[in-house]
């Protein structure tokens, strides 16, 4: 869906990052903010911290958490290691995002970019949209799905039920 919308609205141009590119940019981001780090300063050049930050980055993006959200969360906490970790993670993520925005498109941002396009363009107006083959939705996916539901003329969602009707004596929701 991302590819289709972006092809028709012009959002595919740019160099797409892969895992190697992400690692390089995360290393650069850690170098840029090294002097501002307390808890992570000693490990800022380590491969392990790069991998840890990339793993956190992927989780945050799927959950729709931005660097400024981390800063706001840290500001609400009392002084301590948790506050420092969240604050420092937000600093690293902000530096990483700034590096990416200079020249690259991160596929991890595809759904966020799609959401932004759908907020500005009624792409699905007049269409019937079918939603199938899912086990659940991430925060990014829910934001996009919400916009699709508002725009589409009709939306059909298949519900997967791996349930034995005999277990509920034929009285279940999908019996």
Give residue ranges: language-model regions.
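Conserved P-loop NTPase-based nucleic-acid remodeling module centered on helicase motor cores
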Residues: 1-72, 76, 80
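Conserved helicase NTPase motor core
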Residues: 18-19, 69-175
